[in-house]
Amino acid sequence: MSRLSRALQLTDIDDFITPSQICIKPVEIDKARSKTGAKIKIKGDSCFEESESGKQKLNKVEITLQDCLACSGCITSAEGVLITQQSQEELLRVLQENSKKKATEDWDNVRTIVFSVATQPLLSLAHRYQIGVEDAARHLAGYFRSLGGNYVLSTKVADDIALLECRQEFVERYRENENLTMLSSSCPGWVCYAEKTHGNFILPYVSTTRSPQQIMGVLVKHILAEKLNIPASRIYHVTVMPCYDKKLEASRDDFFSKTNNSRDVDCVITSVEVEQLLGEAQRTLSQFDPLDLDWPWSNVRPDLMVWAHEKTLSGGYAEHVFKFAAKQIFNEVPTNELEFKQLKNRDFREIILKKNGNTVLKFAIANGFRNIQNMVQKLKRGKVSNYHFVEVMACPSGCINGGAQIRPTTGQHVRELTRKLEELYHNLPLSEPENSLTKHIYKDFLDGFQTEKSYELLHTSYHDVVSELSISLNINW
Protein backbone atom coordinates (compact mmCIF):
# COMPACT_ATOMS: atom_id res chain seq x y z
CA MET A 1 0.00 0.00 0.00
CA SER A 2 1.30 3.47 -0.80
CA ARG A 3 2.27 5.54 2.20
CA LEU A 4 -0.84 7.35 3.44
CA SER A 5 -1.64 9.07 6.70
CA ARG A 6 -0.82 6.34 9.18
CA ALA A 7 -3.98 6.94 11.17
CA LEU A 8 -6.02 6.51 8.00
CA GLN A 9 -4.65 3.25 6.67
CA LEU A 10 -7.08 0.39 6.33
CA THR A 11 -6.75 -2.15 9.09
CA ASP A 12 -9.44 -4.67 8.26
CA ILE A 13 -11.07 -5.03 4.85
CA ASP A 14 -12.11 -7.81 2.52
CA ASP A 15 -10.80 -7.26 -0.98
CA PHE A 16 -13.96 -8.77 -2.46
CA ILE A 17 -17.12 -6.74 -1.96
CA THR A 18 -20.40 -8.32 -3.01
CA PRO A 19 -23.89 -6.88 -3.42
CA SER A 20 -24.95 -8.58 -0.20
CA GLN A 21 -23.22 -5.76 1.62
CA ILE A 22 -25.83 -3.38 0.18
CA CYS A 23 -23.49 -0.66 -0.95
CA ILE A 24 -25.60 2.21 -2.22
CA LYS A 25 -22.88 3.18 -4.66
CA PRO A 26 -22.69 -0.22 -6.39
CA VAL A 27 -20.27 -1.05 -9.16
CA GLU A 28 -20.83 -3.87 -11.60
CA ILE A 29 -18.96 -6.96 -10.50
CA ASP A 30 -17.79 -9.29 -13.22
CA LYS A 31 -17.99 -12.60 -11.40
CA ALA A 32 -17.84 -15.85 -13.33
CA ARG A 33 -19.55 -18.81 -11.70
CA SER A 34 -17.31 -21.73 -10.82
CA LYS A 35 -18.25 -25.31 -10.02
CA THR A 36 -15.43 -25.63 -7.56
CA GLY A 37 -14.41 -23.56 -4.62
CA ALA A 38 -11.52 -21.16 -4.59
CA LYS A 39 -9.06 -20.00 -1.98
CA ILE A 40 -7.65 -16.53 -1.51
CA LYS A 41 -4.01 -16.40 -0.49
CA ILE A 42 -2.08 -13.30 0.51
CA LYS A 43 1.53 -13.15 -0.62
CA GLY A 44 3.54 -10.04 0.07
CA ASP A 45 1.50 -7.04 -1.01
CA SER A 46 -0.76 -8.98 -3.40
CA CYS A 47 -3.74 -11.33 -3.11
CA PHE A 48 -4.31 -14.34 -5.40
CA GLU A 49 -7.40 -16.45 -5.99
CA GLU A 50 -6.45 -20.10 -6.55
CA SER A 51 -8.72 -22.71 -8.12
CA GLU A 52 -8.41 -25.84 -10.28
CA SER A 53 -8.17 -23.66 -13.38
CA GLY A 54 -5.14 -21.84 -12.05
CA LYS A 55 -4.60 -18.67 -10.12
CA GLN A 56 -5.17 -15.00 -10.81
CA LYS A 57 -4.18 -11.80 -9.09
CA LEU A 58 -7.13 -10.02 -7.51
CA ASN A 59 -7.70 -6.34 -8.10
CA LYS A 60 -7.12 -4.06 -5.15
CA VAL A 61 -10.30 -2.61 -3.70
CA GLU A 62 -10.60 1.15 -4.05
CA ILE A 63 -12.91 3.29 -1.98
CA THR A 64 -13.37 6.96 -2.78
CA LEU A 65 -14.51 9.67 -0.43
CA GLN A 66 -17.74 9.96 -2.39
CA ASP A 67 -18.40 6.25 -1.80
CA CYS A 68 -17.78 6.78 1.88
CA LEU A 69 -20.16 9.71 2.10
CA ALA A 70 -22.89 7.62 0.50
CA CYS A 71 -22.25 4.43 2.46
CA SER A 72 -24.58 3.38 5.25
CA GLY A 73 -22.10 1.07 6.92
CA CYS A 74 -20.52 3.50 9.34
CA ILE A 75 -20.95 6.85 11.08
CA THR A 76 -17.68 8.75 11.24
CA SER A 77 -15.98 6.64 8.63
CA ALA A 78 -12.96 8.79 7.83
CA GLU A 79 -10.62 6.60 9.88
CA GLY A 80 -11.50 3.51 7.88
CA VAL A 81 -11.33 4.71 4.31
CA LEU A 82 -8.55 4.58 1.77
CA ILE A 83 -8.20 8.30 1.12
CA THR A 84 -6.28 9.22 -1.99
CA GLN A 85 -6.80 12.98 -2.20
CA GLN A 86 -6.99 13.95 1.46
CA SER A 87 -3.63 12.96 2.89
CA GLN A 88 -0.31 14.62 3.59
CA GLU A 89 1.10 12.39 0.86
CA GLU A 90 -1.14 14.06 -1.71
CA LEU A 91 -0.29 17.48 -0.30
CA LEU A 92 3.43 16.84 -0.69
CA ARG A 93 2.87 15.57 -4.23
CA VAL A 94 1.05 18.77 -5.21
CA LEU A 95 3.72 20.94 -3.60
CA GLN A 96 6.52 19.09 -5.40
CA GLU A 97 4.69 19.25 -8.71
CA ASN A 98 4.16 22.98 -8.23
CA SER A 99 7.84 23.46 -7.46
CA LYS A 100 8.81 21.69 -10.70
CA LYS A 101 6.49 23.93 -12.72
CA LYS A 102 8.08 26.99 -11.17
CA ALA A 103 11.54 25.65 -12.00
CA THR A 104 10.56 25.15 -15.65
CA GLU A 105 8.77 28.53 -15.70
CA ASP A 106 5.47 26.87 -16.59
CA TRP A 107 3.68 29.83 -15.04
CA ASP A 108 0.30 29.14 -16.64
CA ASN A 109 0.02 25.94 -14.60
CA VAL A 110 1.61 27.07 -11.35
CA ARG A 111 -0.95 27.03 -8.54
CA THR A 112 -1.25 29.40 -5.61
CA ILE A 113 -1.05 27.31 -2.44
CA VAL A 114 -3.19 28.59 0.44
CA PHE A 115 -3.24 27.10 3.95
CA SER A 116 -6.11 27.89 6.34
CA VAL A 117 -5.50 26.91 9.96
CA ALA A 118 -8.23 26.38 12.56
CA THR A 119 -7.74 27.28 16.21
CA GLN A 120 -7.94 23.77 17.73
CA PRO A 121 -4.94 22.35 15.80
CA LEU A 122 -2.87 25.34 16.94
CA LEU A 123 -3.71 24.49 20.56
CA SER A 124 -2.70 20.88 19.94
CA LEU A 125 0.58 21.84 18.27
CA ALA A 126 1.38 24.47 20.91
CA HIS A 127 0.97 21.88 23.67
CA ARG A 128 2.91 19.21 21.76
CA TYR A 129 5.94 21.44 21.16
CA GLN A 130 5.63 23.43 24.42
CA ILE A 131 5.33 26.87 22.85
CA GLY A 132 2.70 29.61 22.99
CA VAL A 133 -0.38 29.37 20.78
CA GLU A 134 0.43 32.54 18.85
CA ASP A 135 4.03 31.30 18.49
CA ALA A 136 2.73 27.97 17.18
CA ALA A 137 0.77 29.85 14.52
CA ARG A 138 3.84 31.81 13.42
CA HIS A 139 6.17 28.79 13.35
CA LEU A 140 3.53 26.83 11.43
CA ALA A 141 3.37 29.67 8.91
CA GLY A 142 7.14 29.39 8.54
CA TYR A 143 6.90 25.63 8.04
CA PHE A 144 4.18 25.84 5.40
CA ARG A 145 6.09 28.58 3.59
CA SER A 146 9.18 26.34 3.57
CA LEU A 147 7.09 23.67 1.83
CA GLY A 148 6.08 26.09 -0.91
CA GLY A 149 2.92 27.66 0.49
CA ASN A 150 2.05 31.14 -0.72
CA TYR A 151 -0.46 32.16 1.95
CA VAL A 152 -1.09 30.95 5.49
CA LEU A 153 -4.38 32.18 6.94
CA SER A 154 -6.29 31.97 10.20
CA THR A 155 -9.88 30.75 9.98
CA LYS A 156 -11.01 33.46 12.44
CA VAL A 157 -12.97 35.43 9.84
CA ALA A 158 -14.83 32.27 8.76
CA ASP A 159 -15.59 31.42 12.40
CA ASP A 160 -17.01 34.92 12.83
CA ILE A 161 -19.22 34.69 9.75
CA ALA A 162 -20.48 31.22 10.70
CA LEU A 163 -21.70 32.58 14.04
CA LEU A 164 -23.35 35.60 12.40
CA GLU A 165 -25.22 33.38 9.94
CA CYS A 166 -26.19 30.78 12.53
CA ARG A 167 -27.58 33.29 15.01
CA GLN A 168 -29.65 35.05 12.35
CA GLU A 169 -30.96 31.72 11.07
CA PHE A 170 -32.03 30.77 14.59
CA VAL A 171 -33.90 34.03 15.20
CA GLU A 172 -35.78 33.64 11.92
CA ARG A 173 -36.67 30.01 12.68
CA TYR A 174 -37.78 30.86 16.21
CA ARG A 175 -40.08 33.62 15.04
CA GLU A 176 -41.63 31.31 12.44
CA ASN A 177 -42.05 28.34 14.80
CA GLU A 178 -40.68 28.60 18.32
CA ASN A 179 -41.38 24.91 18.95
CA LEU A 180 -39.01 23.65 16.23
CA THR A 181 -35.60 22.71 17.62
CA MET A 182 -32.57 23.89 15.62
CA LEU A 183 -29.46 21.70 15.62
CA SER A 184 -26.02 23.07 14.76
CA SER A 185 -24.32 21.88 11.56
CA SER A 186 -20.60 22.62 11.86
CA CYS A 187 -19.65 19.03 12.80
CA PRO A 188 -19.44 16.79 9.69
CA GLY A 189 -19.44 13.59 11.76
CA TRP A 190 -22.82 14.56 13.17
CA VAL A 191 -24.15 15.65 9.75
CA CYS A 192 -23.11 12.33 8.13
CA TYR A 193 -24.78 10.44 10.96
CA ALA A 194 -27.98 12.49 10.58
CA GLU A 195 -28.11 11.94 6.81
CA LYS A 196 -27.30 8.24 6.84
CA THR A 197 -29.14 7.10 9.93
CA HIS A 198 -32.19 9.32 10.38
CA GLY A 199 -32.62 11.06 7.02
CA ASN A 200 -35.68 13.21 6.46
CA PHE A 201 -36.82 12.90 10.06
CA ILE A 202 -33.85 14.80 11.47
CA LEU A 203 -32.68 17.00 8.55
CA PRO A 204 -35.36 19.74 8.92
CA TYR A 205 -33.94 20.43 12.38
CA VAL A 206 -30.36 20.92 11.13
CA SER A 207 -29.03 24.43 10.56
CA THR A 208 -28.22 25.22 6.92
CA THR A 209 -25.28 27.46 7.85
CA ARG A 210 -22.03 26.13 6.41
CA SER A 211 -19.22 25.15 8.73
CA PRO A 212 -16.30 27.55 9.20
CA GLN A 213 -14.12 25.28 7.04
CA GLN A 214 -16.48 25.57 4.09
CA ILE A 215 -17.05 29.29 4.62
CA MET A 216 -13.26 29.66 4.58
CA GLY A 217 -13.32 27.79 1.28
CA VAL A 218 -15.75 30.37 -0.11
CA LEU A 219 -13.58 33.25 1.10
CA VAL A 220 -10.45 31.76 -0.46
CA LYS A 221 -11.90 30.53 -3.77
CA HIS A 222 -14.14 33.55 -4.36
CA ILE A 223 -12.86 36.63 -2.54
CA LEU A 224 -9.12 35.90 -2.41
CA ALA A 225 -9.14 34.63 -6.00
CA GLU A 226 -10.81 37.87 -7.07
CA LYS A 227 -8.27 39.94 -5.14
CA LEU A 228 -5.39 38.02 -6.74
CA ASN A 229 -7.09 38.18 -10.15
CA ILE A 230 -6.66 34.46 -10.78
CA PRO A 231 -9.19 31.67 -11.46
CA ALA A 232 -10.31 29.75 -8.37
CA SER A 233 -9.13 26.54 -10.03
CA ARG A 234 -5.56 27.90 -9.89
CA ILE A 235 -5.73 28.01 -6.09
CA TYR A 236 -4.95 24.85 -4.12
CA HIS A 237 -6.64 25.34 -0.77
CA VAL A 238 -5.48 23.29 2.21
CA THR A 239 -7.14 23.42 5.62
CA VAL A 240 -5.64 22.24 8.90
CA MET A 241 -8.36 20.75 11.11
CA PRO A 242 -8.77 18.76 14.36
CA CYS A 243 -11.00 16.12 12.81
CA TYR A 244 -10.76 13.45 10.08
CA ASP A 245 -14.41 13.96 9.15
CA LYS A 246 -13.49 17.38 7.79
CA LYS A 247 -11.92 15.46 4.90
CA LEU A 248 -15.32 13.96 4.12
CA GLU A 249 -17.01 17.33 4.41
CA ALA A 250 -14.61 18.95 1.94
CA SER A 251 -15.34 16.17 -0.56
CA ARG A 252 -19.11 16.66 -0.65
CA ASP A 253 -20.53 17.52 -4.06
CA ASP A 254 -22.33 20.43 -2.40
CA PHE A 255 -18.98 22.16 -1.97
CA PHE A 256 -17.83 21.82 -5.56
CA SER A 257 -18.42 25.02 -7.53
CA LYS A 258 -19.37 24.36 -11.13
CA THR A 259 -18.89 28.06 -11.83
CA ASN A 260 -15.28 27.94 -10.64
CA ASN A 261 -14.72 24.29 -11.63
CA SER A 262 -13.13 23.89 -8.24
CA ARG A 263 -13.69 22.53 -4.75
CA ASP A 264 -13.85 25.15 -2.01
CA VAL A 265 -11.34 23.05 -0.05
CA ASP A 266 -8.95 20.85 -2.03
CA CYS A 267 -7.18 19.05 0.79
CA VAL A 268 -7.62 18.66 4.54
CA ILE A 269 -4.77 17.70 6.82
CA THR A 270 -5.04 17.31 10.56
CA SER A 271 -3.08 18.11 13.70
CA VAL A 272 -1.68 14.60 13.98
CA GLU A 273 -0.70 14.60 10.30
CA VAL A 274 1.25 17.83 10.77
CA GLU A 275 3.05 16.14 13.66
CA GLN A 276 3.82 13.18 11.38
CA LEU A 277 5.17 15.45 8.64
CA LEU A 278 7.45 17.19 11.12
CA GLY A 279 8.57 13.83 12.50
CA GLU A 280 9.42 12.54 9.03
CA ALA A 281 11.47 15.70 8.45
CA GLN A 282 13.15 15.09 11.84
CA ARG A 283 12.32 18.64 12.89
CA THR A 284 10.24 20.23 15.62
CA LEU A 285 7.82 23.05 14.91
CA SER A 286 9.90 25.65 16.74
CA GLN A 287 12.90 24.93 14.48
CA PHE A 288 11.17 26.71 11.59
CA ASP A 289 11.47 30.48 11.30
CA PRO A 290 8.42 32.26 12.73
CA LEU A 291 6.52 34.22 10.09
CA ASP A 292 3.39 36.34 10.30
CA LEU A 293 0.17 34.78 9.11
CA ASP A 294 -1.20 36.49 6.03
CA TRP A 295 -4.12 38.91 6.21
CA PRO A 296 -5.34 39.58 2.65
CA TRP A 297 -8.82 40.72 3.68
CA SER A 298 -8.16 44.36 4.56
CA ASN A 299 -5.41 46.92 5.08
CA VAL A 300 -5.90 46.90 8.85
CA ARG A 301 -4.06 43.92 10.27
CA PRO A 302 -4.97 42.65 13.78
CA ASP A 303 -2.21 42.37 16.37
CA LEU A 304 -3.15 38.76 17.15
CA MET A 305 -4.23 35.94 14.83
CA VAL A 306 -5.56 33.27 17.20
CA TRP A 307 -8.85 33.97 18.94
CA ALA A 308 -11.46 32.15 20.98
CA HIS A 309 -15.16 32.31 20.20
CA GLU A 310 -17.01 32.46 23.50
CA LYS A 311 -15.87 30.12 26.27
CA THR A 312 -17.20 26.86 24.84
CA LEU A 313 -14.69 24.77 22.92
CA SER A 314 -16.31 24.08 19.53
CA GLY A 315 -16.88 27.49 18.03
CA GLY A 316 -19.17 28.94 20.69
CA TYR A 317 -22.43 28.31 18.83
CA ALA A 318 -24.76 27.67 21.79
CA GLU A 319 -23.36 30.51 23.87
CA HIS A 320 -23.24 33.11 21.10
CA VAL A 321 -26.65 32.30 19.60
CA PHE A 322 -28.20 32.27 23.09
CA LYS A 323 -26.94 35.77 23.92
CA PHE A 324 -27.95 37.15 20.53
CA ALA A 325 -31.44 35.61 20.65
CA ALA A 326 -32.01 36.83 24.22
CA LYS A 327 -31.27 40.38 23.14
CA GLN A 328 -32.90 40.27 19.70
CA ILE A 329 -36.15 38.52 20.65
CA PHE A 330 -36.64 39.35 24.34
CA ASN A 331 -34.48 42.45 24.81
CA GLU A 332 -32.58 40.63 27.53
CA VAL A 333 -28.84 41.20 27.78
CA PRO A 334 -27.03 38.63 29.97
CA THR A 335 -24.61 40.64 32.11
CA ASN A 336 -22.61 37.77 33.59
CA GLU A 337 -20.71 34.93 31.94
CA LEU A 338 -23.17 32.26 30.89
CA GLU A 339 -23.21 29.13 33.05
CA PHE A 340 -24.38 25.90 31.45
CA LYS A 341 -25.87 23.39 33.87
CA GLN A 342 -24.39 19.89 33.62
CA LEU A 343 -27.02 17.18 33.27
CA LYS A 344 -26.25 13.42 33.13
CA ASN A 345 -22.60 13.95 32.17
CA ARG A 346 -20.14 16.75 31.42
CA ASP A 347 -20.85 16.44 27.70
CA PHE A 348 -24.54 17.28 28.00
CA ARG A 349 -25.30 20.72 29.41
CA GLU A 350 -28.14 23.20 29.17
CA ILE A 351 -28.92 26.85 29.80
CA ILE A 352 -32.31 28.50 30.26
CA LEU A 353 -33.62 32.06 29.91
CA LYS A 354 -36.74 32.84 31.91
CA LYS A 355 -38.99 35.85 31.55
CA ASN A 356 -41.90 36.56 33.88
CA GLY A 357 -41.41 33.11 35.36
CA ASN A 358 -41.69 31.36 32.00
CA THR A 359 -38.91 29.56 30.12
CA VAL A 360 -38.54 31.41 26.82
CA LEU A 361 -35.17 30.04 25.65
CA LYS A 362 -33.70 26.62 26.39
CA PHE A 363 -30.37 25.69 24.80
CA ALA A 364 -28.15 22.63 25.14
CA ILE A 365 -24.70 21.36 24.21
CA ALA A 366 -24.51 17.67 23.26
CA ASN A 367 -21.03 16.24 22.67
CA GLY A 368 -20.26 12.63 21.79
CA PHE A 369 -22.42 10.06 20.05
CA ARG A 370 -23.91 8.68 23.24
CA ASN A 371 -25.50 12.05 23.94
CA ILE A 372 -26.37 12.58 20.28
CA GLN A 373 -28.19 9.25 20.07
CA ASN A 374 -30.09 9.98 23.27
CA MET A 375 -31.06 13.40 21.95
CA VAL A 376 -32.30 11.99 18.63
CA GLN A 377 -34.39 9.35 20.38
CA LYS A 378 -35.95 12.02 22.58
CA LEU A 379 -36.72 14.06 19.47
CA LYS A 380 -38.47 11.06 17.97
CA ARG A 381 -40.53 10.67 21.13
CA GLY A 382 -41.29 14.38 21.23
CA LYS A 383 -39.43 14.85 24.51
CA VAL A 384 -36.69 17.21 23.38
CA SER A 385 -38.75 19.69 21.41
CA ASN A 386 -38.57 22.06 24.38
CA TYR A 387 -34.92 22.71 23.44
CA HIS A 388 -34.82 25.62 21.04
CA PHE A 389 -31.19 25.09 20.01
CA VAL A 390 -28.68 22.28 20.49
CA GLU A 391 -24.97 22.59 19.70
CA VAL A 392 -24.06 19.10 18.46
CA MET A 393 -20.51 17.75 18.20
CA ALA A 394 -19.56 14.10 17.55
CA CYS A 395 -16.43 14.10 19.73
CA PRO A 396 -16.60 14.01 23.54
CA SER A 397 -15.52 17.45 24.84
CA GLY A 398 -16.10 18.83 21.33
CA CYS A 399 -13.62 19.93 18.67
CA ILE A 400 -10.80 20.55 21.11
CA ASN A 401 -10.74 16.76 21.57
CA GLY A 402 -11.18 16.03 17.87
CA GLY A 403 -10.26 12.58 16.61
CA ALA A 404 -7.26 13.94 14.72
CA GLN A 405 -5.73 16.02 17.49
CA ILE A 406 -2.24 14.98 18.59
CA ARG A 407 -2.35 11.96 20.89
CA PRO A 408 -1.46 12.10 24.60
CA THR A 409 2.12 11.33 25.51
CA THR A 410 2.94 8.05 27.23
CA GLY A 411 1.30 7.93 30.63
CA GLN A 412 -0.90 10.96 30.00
CA HIS A 413 -4.67 10.50 30.19
CA VAL A 414 -6.87 11.95 27.45
CA ARG A 415 -8.81 14.00 30.00
CA GLU A 416 -5.60 15.52 31.33
CA LEU A 417 -4.57 16.51 27.80
CA THR A 418 -8.03 17.94 27.08
CA ARG A 419 -7.89 19.97 30.30
CA LYS A 420 -4.54 21.49 29.29
CA LEU A 421 -5.89 22.39 25.84
CA GLU A 422 -8.94 23.96 27.49
CA GLU A 423 -6.62 26.13 29.61
CA LEU A 424 -4.80 27.30 26.49
CA TYR A 425 -8.12 28.09 24.80
CA HIS A 426 -9.53 30.05 27.74
CA ASN A 427 -6.41 32.26 27.75
CA LEU A 428 -7.04 33.38 24.16
CA PRO A 429 -8.64 36.78 23.46
CA LEU A 430 -12.37 36.66 22.68
CA SER A 431 -13.49 37.52 19.17
CA GLU A 432 -16.53 39.68 18.54
CA PRO A 433 -17.97 38.33 15.26
CA GLU A 434 -19.72 41.53 14.27
CA ASN A 435 -16.61 43.54 13.45
CA SER A 436 -15.33 45.87 10.74
CA LEU A 437 -13.92 43.03 8.63
CA THR A 438 -17.07 40.91 8.54
CA LYS A 439 -19.10 44.05 7.76
CA HIS A 440 -16.67 44.80 4.92
CA ILE A 441 -16.96 41.27 3.50
CA TYR A 442 -20.76 41.33 3.57
CA LYS A 443 -20.91 44.79 2.00
CA ASP A 444 -18.26 44.48 -0.71
CA PHE A 445 -18.35 40.79 -1.64
CA LEU A 446 -21.71 39.32 -0.60
CA ASP A 447 -24.02 42.17 -1.70
CA GLY A 448 -24.90 42.80 1.95
CA PHE A 449 -26.27 40.81 4.88
CA GLN A 450 -29.13 38.35 4.26
CA THR A 451 -28.92 38.69 0.48
CA GLU A 452 -29.47 36.03 -2.14
CA LYS A 453 -25.72 35.87 -2.81
CA SER A 454 -24.80 35.54 0.87
CA TYR A 455 -27.34 32.74 1.33
CA GLU A 456 -26.07 30.90 -1.75
CA LEU A 457 -22.44 31.03 -0.61
CA LEU A 458 -22.82 30.67 3.15
CA HIS A 459 -25.56 28.03 3.43
CA THR A 460 -25.94 24.46 2.21
CA SER A 461 -28.42 21.60 1.97
CA TYR A 462 -28.48 17.99 3.18
CA HIS A 463 -29.39 14.64 1.65
CA ASP A 464 -31.59 11.83 2.88
CA VAL A 465 -29.12 9.00 2.34
CA VAL A 466 -31.49 6.61 4.14
CA SER A 467 -34.05 7.01 1.32
CA GLU A 468 -31.32 6.65 -1.31
CA LEU A 469 -30.36 3.37 0.33
CA SER A 470 -33.91 2.00 0.18
CA ILE A 471 -34.10 2.89 -3.52
CA SER A 472 -30.77 1.18 -4.21
CA LEU A 473 -32.08 -2.10 -2.81
CA ASN A 474 -34.21 -2.46 -5.94
CA ILE A 475 -31.17 -2.55 -8.22
CA ASN A 476 -31.01 -5.71 -10.32
CA TRP A 477 -27.61 -7.33 -9.97
Swiss-Prot record:
The keyword Nucleotide-binding does not apply. [4Fe-4S] cluster 1 binds at residues 23, 68, 71, 74. Keywords: 4Fe-4S, Iron, Iron-sulfur, Metal-binding. The keyword Iron-sulfur applies. InterPro entries: Cytosolic_Fe-S_CAF, Fe_hydrogenase, Fe_hydrogenase_lsu_C, Fe_hydrogenase_ssu. GO terms for biological process: iron-sulfur cluster assembly. [4Fe-4S] cluster 2 binds at residues 187, 243, 395, 399. GO terms for molecular function: 4 iron, 4 sulfur cluster binding; metal ion binding. It comes from the Eukaryota. Coiled coil: none annotated. Component of the cytosolic iron-sulfur (Fe/S) protein assembly machinery. Required for maturation of extramitochondrial Fe/S proteins. Belongs to the NARF family. This is Probable cytosolic Fe-S cluster assembly factor GE22682. It comes from Drosophila yakuba.
